[in-house]
Amino acid sequence: MSTKTSIRGKSKKLTLSILISTVIYLLILLRLTLIEPNWILEIDLSEYSFIKTMGIIIVSVGFILGILALIAMKNSWRVGIKYNQKTALVTSGIYSISRNPYFLSYDILIFGYILIFPSIILMFLYLTLVYVFHKMILEEEKYLQSVHNKHYLKYKKKVNRYLTIKL
């Protein structure tokens, strides 16, 4: 008999972030297939095709960053905080330059989509999502510090929350 271990935590912030992300992707999908741009208060940047090109590049960077984050996490990956599960503290790979590369990848990815499909509604949802992600990160940091104590504090001093640039 196998027992499945859930990878999803439970919190209002997590549920809200999933809801906002879903709405963003549905609006993008609807924009691609069915609706007129004005419905989502789209901003006309047709004169600036380089912005869409930058958006495509940024989406690609966000996608690759997300894949690298998932690969580095291996079996430690969770959606939200699972207080009853202790996983390894991952500090190598992409986690050596960002403590939160998966959240960062989502921020980058959705920002790229907004450059491709500039919309006031999408921008508002994006900023809300970035705020919710930040709150989730702060909550996760407290949890990681309580579970990994000195190891996490050492990691926290060495690697920035979002991006560590070493020159």
Model-derived segments and spans:
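Active-site-proximal inter-transmembrane loops
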Residues: 82-103
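Membrane-anchoring alpha-helices and their flanking helix-loop junctions
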Residues: 1-88, 109-167
